[in-house]
UniProtKB/Swiss-Prot annotation:
It catalyses: L-seryl-tRNA(Sec) + selenophosphate + H(+) = L-selenocysteinyl-tRNA(Sec) + phosphate. This is L-seryl-tRNA(Sec) selenium transferase. GO terms for cellular component: cytoplasm. It comes from Stutzerimonas stutzeri (strain A1501) (Pseudomonas stutzeri). Belongs to the SelA family. GO terms for biological process: conversion of seryl-tRNAsec to selenocys-tRNAsec; selenocysteine incorporation. Converts seryl-tRNA(Sec) to selenocysteinyl-tRNA(Sec) required for selenoprotein biosynthesis. SUPFAM superfamilies: PLP-dependent transferases. Pathway: Aminoacyl-tRNA biosynthesis; selenocysteinyl-tRNA(Sec) biosynthesis; selenocysteinyl-tRNA(Sec) from L-seryl-tRNA(Sec) (bacterial route): step 1/1. Pfam families: Se-cys_synth_N, SelA.
């Protein structure tokens, strides 16, 4: 068939099969897709490589529809996080509770008093929406919020220590994900790094000896994403605050994960809390909103009213501020902390972190037979004890007792790697991608975070199709 037998774009646009596509995707998108499709087919058609049926209006409309569906498919995809890492940075960290989701919906749909004082009828400050609540929960004098904790650290350093020295222990010069390094952030903030002590041991006398007329602040960083054990020494917040205040210097403490409550109450490892840092004398404390706090991505800066005011006057503050959706979600999450007795029931991240191993194992035993039937006799599916992680740099050596579906190919060890990669890829290609981890010649699906069991089971039928490709 020659290219002259290709239908014209106008003819395709008028074809009944294309009308639903035009309604759904718009005329311009359909037109561009049809032109691209016809351009690709013109040469094969000229050479007679295509049958008449392949060039029919119905077939071409179908191919255009497939392309348009792919083009318009959202890149933001829901996934099943069965990796065993609860606050997974690459998978969005904390899952928000229903109260926060409802607050976001209202804030997105309607105008709100973001920077408007309803009492006076004048312009307001967006921090006012959550300041009183955070002060109540932390005991801080004042509060400001930016878009993440890295921004909080940058803003605080630049506001309090620009063109001066920042004194910090060598053992706290951490790097977290995305090449965020404390020395680099200090340099960007205009603060000259003055490191003291050694990697494993730093003493109060090291800070004392480092203070000089060029000193701008003392900084303490909670090393939440790694642990130095053995012959170690560090200076507690209270002692460091005493040293700083004796020389009229502020103490900035970066808590990173930012817990507001003692997590050991729910059987989790204890993390230093914001309240403890402030009570021990830290003038400014920074922490994340989407890690242990269980809220949206945000960086919270709390502490001295005078220093917070100085931070808020920094022109960088506007560049780093949060939007209405973040503030709405953050307020809703923080409100849950007013009732700590019910927090594990209502705060999604805490509920998942504290989920009992026995409950997870029961769920795994319920699902295992179905998954085994889908995979067939060439695979072994076993319910196995597992050890998960909190994630997002919190308590790196702590493990969460859990249970997993351990998928192992029934073949010689030298052949297992390829088979495991195939099933891992097939799970990622499901309508709701399933993400696990490969370890010890098996694919592990840790079920700690499997909330929607019906949706997981419903799509297992597609797994056979993906494996057959």
């Amino acid at each position: 068939m020659s290219s002259s037998h290709l239908p014209s774009v106008d003819k395709l646009l008028r074809d009944p099969a294309c009308q639903p596509l035009q309604q759904r995707y718009g005329r311009q998108a359909l037109l561009a897709t049809l032109r691209d499709l016809l351009d690709e087919l013109r040469e094969p058609a000229r050479r007679g490589q295509l049958a008449a049926l392949e060039l029919s209006e119905a077939v071409l409309a179908g191919r255009a529809g497939e392309r348009l569906a792919t083009q318009h498919k959202s890149r933001v995809r829901r996934v099943f996080n069965l990796t065993g890492t609860v606050l997974h940075t690459n998978l969005g960290r904390a899952l928000l509770p229903d109260e926060a989701i409802e607050a976001i919906t209202l804030a997105a749909r309607y105008p709100l008093n973001l920077e408007f004082d309803l009492a006076t009828g004048k312009r307001g400050d967006r921090d006012d929406l959550i300041e009183e609540l955070i002060r109540e929960l932390t005991g801080a004098e004042a509060v400001t919020v930016v878009n993440n904790n890295a921004a909080a650290v940058l803003l605080a350093l630049n506001s309090l220590g620009a063109r001066k020295e920042g004194i910090i222990s060598r053992g706290e010069l951490i790097e977290i994900g995305g090449a965020f390094r404390i020395p680099d952030i200090m340099a960007r903030a205009g603060v000259k790094l003055h490191e003291v002590g050694t990697t494993n041991r730093t003493h109060a006398k090291d800070y004392e000896a480092a203070i000089n007329p060029r000193s701008g602040l003392l900084m303490r960083v909670h090393t939440s994403n790694y642990s130095v054990q053995g012959f170690t020494a560090s200076v507690a917040t209270a002692e460091l605050a005493r040293i700083a205040h004796a020389h009229d210097l502020p103490l900035l403490e970066d808590l990173g994960s930012g817990s507001l409550l003692d997590l050991s109450r729910w059987g989790l490892p204890k993390e230093p809390t914001v309240q403890e840092a402030l009570r021990d004398g830290a003038d400014i404390v920074t922490f994340s909103g989407d890690k242990l706090l269980g809220g949206p991505q945000a960086g919270l800066i709390v502490g001295s009213k005078a220093l917070i005011q100085k931070i808020k006057k920094n022109p960088l503050k506007r560049a780093l501020r949060v939007d209405k959706l973040t503030l709405a979600a953050l307020e809703a999450v923080l409100n849950l902390y007013r009732d700590p007795d019910r927090l594990a029931e209502r705060l999604t991240s805490l509920r998942l972190l504290s989920r009992p191993q026995a409950e997870i194992r029961t769920q795994a035993e319920r699902i295992a037979p179905t998954l085994a039937a889908v995979l067939g006799e060439s695979w072994q599916v076993a319910v196995t004890d597992a050890l998960g992680m909190i994630g997002s740099g919190a308590q790196p050596v702590a493990r969460l007792p859990s249970a997993a579906l351990c998928i192992r190919p029934q073949q010689p060890k030298r052949l297992r790697g390829r088979s495991l990669r195939q099933v891992e890829e097939a799970l990622r290609c499901l309508p709701i991608p399933v993400l696990g981890r490969i370890d010890d010649d098996a694919l592990w699906l840790d079920l700690r975070q499997l909330d929607d069991e019906p949706a997981f089971l419903q799509q297992l039928a597609h797994l056979q199709e993906e494996l057959a490709r």
